[in-house]
Structures are given as C-alpha cells and as structure tokens.
Amino acid sequence: MRYLLILSMLGLSIFLSACGSSANSTGAKEAVEDYVNALASNDEASLSALSCADWETSALTELDSLQAVTATLDGFSCQQSGTDGETALVNCEGKMILSYNDEDQELDLSTRTYRVVEQNGNWLVCGVQ
C-alpha cells in the first residue's frame, strides 16, 4: 500500500511538472509574439510593458528606427527553442515587411533568438542574440 502511494505521488509530480513546462513555454512564446506585433504596429506602450527593465531602452530604440516605415508581418510564428538558466529562448519564423515610399524591404525574423524571463508572473522580452 505504501509503495502504491509513493508511486502515485511520483506520477502526479511528473504530470504536474510537464504541465508547468508547457504553460511556461506558451507564456514565453506569446510574449515574443506580442512583442514583435507591438513593434510592427508601433505600439510603444505595449512594447514597454512586454520588455524587462534592462531591455526597455533597447526596445524603444528599435521602435524609433521603425517610425518612418509601415511594417507588416508575413508568415509570422514563434516557438520556444530552449532555455539558458532562468531564461527562455524563443525563435520565430516569417518576415517583417517594411514599406517606405512604395518600396519594400524584408527582415528575416528567424535570424534572432529572443531572451525571455518571467518576472512577477509575466513573461518579458529581455534581449536578443
């Protein structure tokens, strides 16, 4: 009986750990998707809210560089690719199309890996590599 109880508790803890990892992976992925969408739509308030304090200035500088263009996303999706200690690593696919004076330039979104951290229950972008 005691052996069965220990096995049940072990199974439950593994199940709950797997559920927690899935939720964390989704949270980091969604944070990056929201962050890139905020960049594309020139949404400064959302971009600030989705950035950790150490990254916010860099995020706003990147947003400033997009002020003269119209940005749209094409084939955009993200997924968590791994972790680095407490940091989730998220990669995206697709491209950001930047339009200026009827000319388009494409930015390949797969060239960046976003560093995402959880702070106070919120996933925040905290750098790129």
Model-found features: residue ranges?
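C-terminal motif of bacterial Sec signal peptides marking the signal peptidase cleavage site
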Residues: 15-18
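Bacterial signal peptide processing site
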Residues: 20-23
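Exposed beta-sheet edge and beta->alpha loop/turn motif
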Residues: 85-129
